Amino acid sequence: MDGRGLRPYMNTREDRAIRFLGLPTLLRSTGDDTNGAFGLVEHWSMPTGFASPYHVHHLEDEAFYVLEGELAFVCDGKWIRTGAGGYVFGPREIPHGFKVTGTGPARMLLLCAPAGFERFVMELGEDPDAPAVEPDIPKLVAVAAKYKIDILGPLPG
């Protein structure tokens, strides 16, 4: 342990798996692991056509690193397409979202700094072995507001 109270650790896909917005999701790091510095989430099997809502974070910045597949990101109304190895930064206070555009599933890491977004993910998380269901939008909006995230609606055209 160092002076900040942090310990090295490792996790596997089985350690902190949940289903978030119908997606198989893994909590790689939480604020508890990083002393509040960041949270790291892996969406490890996003189907073609999946789209996040257009939204704004007021407390944290988001960084997306695409591991597999093809995605389109929209940030402040501007679209960016990228594939494996692509990196997109979404600053707080700027509307953004993404959708899977390739012919197969996509996988990405989502880092939020400071930590906190992962608590939103955990609160909405479901049993990873349960079948995927459509998200409960009123619940999503209410829980997002608790974490200072505004859900603006579907992604812009």
Model-assigned labels for residue ranges:
Residues 50, 57, 71, 87, ...:
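Hydrophobic small-molecule pocket/channel-lining residues, especially in calycin-type beta-barrels
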Residues 42-47, 56-74, 111-112:
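Short, conserved beta-strand element in jelly-roll/cupin
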Residues 33-35, 46-50, 63, 70-72, ...:
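Short, charged/polar surface micro-motifs in flexible loops or helix N-caps
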Residues 122-157:
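Acidic/histidine-enriched, glycine/proline-rich intrinsically disordered or flexible terminal extensions
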Residues 72, 83, 92-118:
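Ligand-binding loop in jelly-roll beta-barrel domains
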Residues 17-54, 60-61:
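A short glycine-rich, His/Asp/Glu-containing loop-to-beta-strand
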Residues 1-3, 9, 115-117, 125, ...:
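Glyoxalase I/VOC metalloenzyme domain signal
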Residues 9-11, 18, 70, 77-95:
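Short acidic-glycine-tyrosine-enriched beta hairpin
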